[in-house]
Amino acid sequence: MVSLRLPLILLSLLAISFSCSAAPPPVYDTEGHELSADGSYYVLPASPGHGGGLTMAPRVLPCPLLVAQETDERRKGFPVRFTPWGGAAAPEDRTIRVSTDVRIRFNAATICVQSTEWHVGDEPLTGARRVVTGPLIGPSPSGRENAFRVEKYGGGYKLVSCRDSCQDLGVSRDGARAWLGASQPPHVVVFKKARPSPPE
C-alpha cells in the first residue's frame, strides 16, 4: 500500500510544480507590484521626454474617440483597467500576466456615453489600423478586435494587438496629435498605479 502511494504523491507534486511554472510572469507597475484586474493604471512612456500618457481624442467626428498620446509629458492621460480576455485566466487569478490576452478600457466617462473599451479598427480616411474606444463597427471574422497583450520590451513593456495576428502598437503623428495604432516602432510603456481621488 505504501509502495503505491509514494509514486502517486510524487506524480501529484510533479503536476503541481509543472502547472505553477507554466504560468507566464506577471506584469509589474512602476512600484514593483503586480498589475491586477482590480486596479487602474496610467500608461506612460518608459523614457522621459517622449510625451505623456494615453488619453481619448476625437479624430474627425466627435465620436467614437480614438486612443491618443498626450503631447505634454506632465499629463498622465486617463487610467486604464485590464481584464483577462474571454476567460483566459482562472477567475480567482486577478493578476495580469505577460503574453496573455486581455481587454483594456479607460476608467473614465466620456461625452460619447458609450463604452471606453479598446478595439482595433481601420480608419476610414487612411486605412490605418488605430485603437478606438466604443462599440465595434464591422467586426472581423476572428472576433478578436479587443484582444491585446502586454509584452516585456527593453526597459519597459509594449502593447500588442492580437486582432488577426499579433502586431505591435506604436504611436504615429498626424498633425498635432499622436495616435496609438498598429505601427513600428512599438510604443514602450510603463504602468503607474492610479490613486483614488481624495473626497472633497
Curated annotation (Swiss-Prot):
Residues 1-22 form the signal peptide. GO terms for molecular function: alpha-amylase inhibitor activity; serine-type endopeptidase inhibitor activity. Pfam families: Kunitz_legume. CDD domains: beta-trefoil_STI_ASI. Gene3D superfamilies: 2.80.10.50. The keyword Signal applies. Keywords: Alpha-amylase inhibitor, Disulfide bond, Protease inhibitor, Serine protease inhibitor, Signal. Disulfide bonds join C63-C112, C162-C166. The keyword Disulfide bond applies. The record marks A88, A89 as: Reactive bond. InterPro entries: Kunitz_inhibitor_STI-like_sf, Prot_inh_Kunz-lg. PROSITE patterns: SOYBEAN_KUNITZ. It comes from the Eukaryota. Belongs to the protease inhibitor I3 (leguminous Kunitz-type inhibitor) family. PANTHER family: KUNITZ TRYPSIN INHIBITOR 2, KUNITZ TRYPSIN INHIBITOR 5. This protein inhibits independently subtilisin and T.castaneum alpha-amylase but not barley alpha-amylase. This is Alpha-amylase/subtilisin inhibitor. It comes from Oryza sativa subsp. japonica.
